[in-house]
Amino acid sequence: MAGPLLLVAGGSGIVPLMAMIRHRRAARSTVPTRLLYSSRTAEDIIYAEEMDQLVATQPGLGIYHTLTRAQPHGWTGYARRIDVDMLREVATPLGSALRSYVCGPTSLVESVADQLTALGLPADRIRTERFGPTGGTL
């Protein structure tokens, strides 16, 4: 696993990125890795307990949450949709050689990819996986 890595997920888009984080753990990798995960509410955070455990035990791993709907009392994470300022704050410590993987709803993935490009990350260092309605009816 070459790095550093910036992983960005929205909703259930966390599933393939968690597989990458688990692989990182299994390989005993210390590649600097940051995950920025957008959820509607704290109750919608998939793998919340596992993420807490991983951050506590995996050197070089940082996990950052943003909630777009409701934040519980005392919330210390981000409280808005992912934007260029948030990406800059999370990604800058990784340096300019980072690679990014973005997975989630189409609108989130396209927005994040555009913002990463605006921050100067070359398009060939941004990998995306998106999902959403197909638009067809049966």
State where each predicted segment sits.
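Short helix-loop-beta connector
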Residues: M1-P4, L94-S96
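Conserved beta-strand elements of the Class I
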Residues: L5-L6, Y101
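Alpha-helix N-cap/helix-start capping motif
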Residues: G11-S12, T106
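Conserved hydrophobic packing residues within short motifs/helices of P-loop NTPase cores
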Residues: L6-V8, L36
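Histidine-anchored nucleotide/phosphate-binding helix
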Residues: I14-A26
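The start of beta-strands in P-loop NTPase/AAA+ ATPase cores
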Residues: P4-L5, D124
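Reductase modules of NAD(P)H-dependent flavoproteins
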Residues: R25, V31-L138
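Surface-exposed beta-strand edges and their flanking turn/coil or helix-capping segments
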Residues: M1-A2, G10, M20, A48-E50, ...
